[in-house]
Structures are given as C-alpha cells and as structure tokens.
C-alpha cells in the first residue's frame, strides 16, 4: 500500500469530514501488580509513560505526512480490578489517579481500563473497583471506566446490573462528566479502540496499536450520488466506500505500530459520528429515504448500513476487531439530536436499533430523578439483546436535569436533550439479583 493510493482515496471521498478517530495503544499492566497499592500505582504510571511516551508525537507526524486528521490518541490498559485485587486496599482511586497522571504526562485525551469483568460473579477486586468508580471519575480528568455484566457464554449477572444502576446515579451526583466516561457492557471486546469502553484484554499482547476510523459524512456523500436507486445499489455503494475509509485506517495503524515498535492489533470498522454538521450517522440513514431517523424503516436502514460497512471493511485490512459497526450516540450526532427534539426518536426505538448497531443506548440524557432500579432495568434490557444475539451491547446514560432540558458536554461528546423515561417501576424485578443463565444457543462445544 503506497502514499499514491491514499491520495487517490482522499480525492475519491472528497474529504467529507473523514478522519481517523483514534489511535489507541493497549498496554498490559499485569507486570505492575504489587501487594502495596502505592507501589502498584507507581509501576502503572511508569509503564504507561515508558510505552506510550511517543504515541502523540507519532500520531501527529503521521497525520501531517498523510494530510489525514487523527483526532484522538488514547491508551487502554488491563482492567484495573485485576491489578487492584493483589492489594489489600479498600478503594482503587490511587490507581485511577496514576492513570490520569500518566495520561497528562504523555498528552493523550483519554485513558480507558478502570474496568471490571463480572459477567459471572464478583471476585475480590471487582466490587471494590465498582464502588470506587464515582470517586475515581470525579477526581480524574481523563480516566474512563467500564464494567462487563453479561456475556452470551455466561448469561447476565443481575446483582452487578443492580449495583451499576446505583453507581451510575452516584457517579452523576459526584461529577458533571462522570457518567459520560462510564459504560456498562454485555459481551465487551478486548481490543476496542473507542472510549469510554476501551480496556486491554488479558489475552492481548503486551503492547498493541488499535485504530478506529470514522466517515459517516463520506458515506452520505456517496449515497447522495445514487439517490432513488435500488437497495442493491445502496448496499454496493456503502460497501465500496467503507473499503476506502478502512484502507486508510490500515495504513495509519501499520505506520504507527512500525514507528512505535509495537504490534499492530486491529482496525475497528465502526462509523463514529461527531456533533459537527456533515458527520452524522443519522443523516446517512435519512439519505436512504427516511424523513427523520426514528420513523418506521430506521432499523432496516441501520441493518443495511451496519452490514455493508463490515463487508467493505473486512477486505481492506488484515485484522478487524473492536466494535465494528455504526455508532448511534445521541449527544454525539447532530441528526440524532434533531430527531429527539422533533419527537421522532424515543428510547424504545433506540433500544430496537441497538439490536443492529455497534454498542447500545449511548450518550443518552435521562431525568436526574430516574430511580437507580429503572437505570438497572435499562442495562438488563440492553444486556439481554446482546447476550441473546451474540453481540456487544452497552449503556452509557447520563441522569441529569429534567425532561426537555439540554445537557451540554462539549467537544466530541456534544449535547443531548433529556429524554422521557417510562415511569412504571422495575424495582421488584431488579431486587431479585442473582444470574440470568446463558441462552441455550451459547452451548457450542
């Protein structure tokens, strides 16, 4: 793959807000384990600074050479619950602060991995980490947190679901931005380059580079040229465009891993929007013929988009991974925000769309007085969709303000109207706790 190919590709896609959304370095912290939490925190800081010290500079150099914006440089680490479990500490905020200090030192804009994997139950470090989340996110600037509460192989840990409903409310009370940096997953992946859900899986190499690309504006421009034509043409157009976008991600990842002297992991084939006009997944779906996203046909349009992005992207790179699909975060997509304000898009339709897309109920503002049991029930519903359909689903919701308010996050996180939530109670359902067993079709052996 040479530079000529890249310049041709840029010309073909007419630079419609195309960017490489993130270069994320995954770093294993297993060799930083220590029974003393202060010593462990110091080891964590030094390993991140040593391994990722040149990440931002290399990203900037590649961006300048190729003329392609590389918006974010980020780091993901081994789930901190594993590192903390070796200590006798009763909270893991010192480890979160070490991550934050390292992020500031190397200049990345997020560091992910203040995480726990509890799909089948709690180990020693898991509950401590989960209870540390509100304070950890309030007292750091760049740390992101995630908790995996279910998987197709394990079922859904409903005790953890109940706890996370409470933790999201506590996180929202403790800080303005906290809930925007906290994701609850089912079927979380170990090589996700996107925040806030990135962590470095224990099955990964010591250090890897993962890349996430973004080009909804590019796909929309391509579809404008085939307006009114059949879905066969639409599918082929999306597929070819996704190939071009992903090819650039492959090149950027290859160059970054080569210059940093670390393994190249994956390209995530996700279409990630921003609040900027012309960078919206919602507008891509509307270009297929929907008056407004949220109307009937939205889920079918999303299914076509998601599938063809994967088909085009797979051909373009050596290894694909991460979440790979279309993101539908409300606050980060100008078209989604408009549809919510018009009343065309509600929580129930968003939930239906999550059966198709990457992730799930993402960056959605709900009233601050929503009970934690209702939030837990939303998590349970999303987890059920993921577990039954063998896909990643997640919840990143922000309980702030009252219905109709506009919540401002700023930057890539955008702004979101506070959406109405079903007021009937799920409290007795959530109070049961325990485990929803794995589905019958999970038994593959």
UniProtKB/Swiss-Prot annotation:
InterPro entries: UPF0210 (IPR007841). It comes from the Bacteria. Homodimer. PANTHER family: UPF0210 PROTEIN MJ1665 (PTHR37560:SF1), UPF0210 PROTEIN SPR0218 (PTHR37560). Belongs to the UPF0210 family. This is UPF0210 protein SMU_73.
